[in-house]
């Protein structure tokens, strides 16, 4: 089939082999082609020993593939690679556990996680690994297993080592022509028709909210600079947003606009820099610090509009993470990166099912690294390199929309505001 049950004659030197199998909607979700491409890219060879293709849309397919490599090291490397997308060695056996040697250190051969749903076979029991996240270890405690960041491991905790007994579930494309977000993981392009994609996102948000799920927005200061802050305020006041993740810049420029009508000293109504406008952002930070923080400024009537005002008055939880380039920062900004990660993980694990990244490359990549693969993730930026980087850094499930953030928010609000779609 295609490249044949056998791509080429097995090399005389290729004496190391392993049989893997993969199940599910492996053809239309591009899982099997990706596995075969990975094998070829690694200069290994394959033989498809068995292939069963589902006859209807609801039927899963099955493939059993023998991988042959010239060395044991090459075989281990390619098997580990194809496991990341759902291929499993036949007879995986029991997972091996070793204690962490000290705080903040995994065993040397620890299993490094993906953001896909994963199970581990421990003592004859199959344990689902909670809180899927890339680049973590797997902690086993009693009858439970969960992803554990390196910074949180403590001496003596039992950590999965090697790949034996670990099963990764491939992320499959939704079934049927009406499936919401069947376009996930599509390539980035500024020429794609966006109206249908935004309509599908609005439908996904409605469904998630009706089922009690949470919607997360990760936003950069460009939302304010482009005059789109009021659009985000409308999303918040409409009850569509549950969490806001940002740095120091977004709230600073939002508050600068609320107090002075400028962002980075430029009037958002006239588009012109004002005299001494370059001082406004620092004066805004100082005023909020004087009032004791954002929440206090809202209670005292000092802050009466804007994104942060809307968050405070509509109960939207926010996490503000600082950086070394921040002025101030604002009192609510957390300057400990480990605490920031923990705060964001806590919100994500509380039921986030949709994440929308708005014009912030570094923050989007950071949050994307924390998200499970099943979270619907949309990255919006005018720069195609930004949305490409998010996928390249591991958040492969993300959809990139190359467009102005204001246009995106306006179209999304229009779709969410249609009475017949409520």
Task: State the predicted function of each range.
Residues 215, 233-236, 240-286, 357:
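Active-site histidine-anchored catalytic micro-motif
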